[in-house]
Regions:
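Active-site loop-to-helix "anion-binding N-cap" substructures in soluble metabolic enzymes
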Residues: 1-190
């Protein structure tokens, strides 16, 4: 993973550099974001880190709803770095506009972030609109670094964001680096 970070940090690119910032380990993702903050043009936010950034700008996501959740703990631990990124790089942060969750019938359902009034279920993927936007940005970038999945890709219902963005990267003509075991597993699975 260090080599992946270094390959982005030490190269010069003429076009846009994009980082897909997702996964379960928000602290790791946010640390990489701050390390690469002056090299990356677009941070495509998803996973737990995406919810924490949305929480920091006032949305009702990124909060614990169960005893085993770690949102609140990770938010407190990363608040200063999140706030720094929001203040220093507001135009580079690309937030999800919709999120997916499991409805009462066990199906994938989506909601716009603006319509979330209280977090009463887990968000398990970025929504279709966000996926389309992220895939377009990634496909038009000169370099893309993927650090974490955008959703719970192990469950096919919530693999949509991760799979479609990875496919857009693969179909594009860009320098790409994948960091992290979960993202590598997603590539192997799909």
């Amino acid at each position: 993973e260090y080599e992946a970070n270094s390959s982005i940090a030490t190269k010069e690119f003429d076009g846009e550099v994009t980082m897909v910032a997702g996964g379960k380990k928000a602290t790791d993702v946010i640390d990489v974001m701050t390390a690469l903050e002056n090299k990356v043009d677009n941070f495509l936010l998803g996973g737990i880190a995406g919810e924490l950034f949305l929480r920091a700008i006032g949305y009702e996501v990124g909060r614990d709803i169960g005893d085993m959740d770690l949102y609140d703990e990770q938010f407190v631990r990363n608040r200063e770095k999140i706030q720094h990124m929001i203040e220093a790089h507001p135009s580079e942060l690309v937030h999800p506009t919709d999120l997916a969750y499991e409805d009462e019938n066990g199906e994938r359902a989506e909601v716009t972030v603006a319509d979330v009034r209280a977090k009463d279920h887990d968000f398990l993927d970025v929504g279709a609109d966000t996926t389309s936007q992220y895939a377009d940005i990634a496909a038009n970038s000169e370099a893309v670094f993927v650090k974490g999945a955008l959703g719970v890709f192990e469950d096919e219902r919530f693999s949509y964001g991760t799979v479609n963005v990875l496919e857009a990267i693969a179909a594009g003509d860009c320098f790409s680096v994948v960091g992290g075991g979960d993202t590598s597993r997603a590539i192997e699975m799909y």
